[in-house]
Amino acid sequence: ELISLLISQRAPKRALLLGPTYSEYARELNLVGGTLEYYNLKEEQDFRLDISDLTDTLKSDIDLLIICNPNNPTSSAISTADMKKLLTVCRSLGIFVMIDETYIEFAPEGTSLSAVSLVPEFDNFMVIRGVSKFFAAPGLRFGYGLTSNQAFLQTLLTHQNPWSLNSIGAYAGERMLKDTDYIQKTWSLIDSERTRMCTELSGLDTVKIYPAYANFVLVKILKEGLTSFDVFEKAIHQNLMIRDCSSFESLNGEYVRFCIMNPEDNDRLLDVFRSL
């Protein structure tokens, strides 16, 4: 809801997305009727953003820049320091930035990725977050946003659905954010299993993996004649669901994405990749 509300109220004539990324951004942008363009992250750079190249590309006729950090499906991320550089350039060009940090809680220890600390310094962006991923509670529809742009915040409040969050969702969301035991256990599991999975997969010559900062890993299929759908089907036959990424902007039929699971299911998925 917050993504839709933000985009509808910014109503950009020209928006820029860092691709490949979550398809709902494009859907909401198409509903408001503006022009949508992609700045595609480069595979040869492991889908990491080249800040200098992007800032050289930005022009003042762009109204809205949308960033998912860490990004879905690449699991790549932008550091807080680089985000500050980007926001500085965007502010000088009059570009508003939406930063979706839905997966930020999964980031490895010691990485500085969140833009929340930049909120007091810049009024040309909004950070949005939710509980659907880290807390495995998509049905609550509980999310929140942070911005220092008081005028835009008032616009959002004016146009927000008055019944967007019920009392049960509000109570559950508050309890979740205070559940430090769950937070630590979940983060530790994801962090250790992500490291293990990436280490194991990096030793296979049939796939290529990319540095991962979220709870999922992007994999490129290197074996000739094997498509992402083929790998998807192999996983399904083992009762494992992975994502065929061929529907993402700029990704062809060579990529799949999998989420970090419990160790036993991760072992079964490793067997699928080893069998390629």
Annotate the PLM regions.
Residues 37, 44-108:
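Active-site phosphate-binding strand-loop segment of PLP-dependent enzymes
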Residues 81, 237-240, 247-276:
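PLP-dependent enzyme catalytic core of the Aspartate aminotransferase-like
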Residues 24, 124-210:
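PLP-dependent aminotransferase class I/II
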Residues 191, 204-238:
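Conserved PLP-binding catalytic core of the aspartate aminotransferase-like
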Residues 1-13, 143:
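Conserved beta-loop-alpha segment that forms the PLP phosphate-binding cup at the N-terminus of a helix
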Residues 9-28:
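Conserved PLP-anchoring active-site segment centered on the Schiff-base-forming lysine
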Residues 32, 92-93, 122, 238:
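Helix C-cap/helix->beta junction micro-motif
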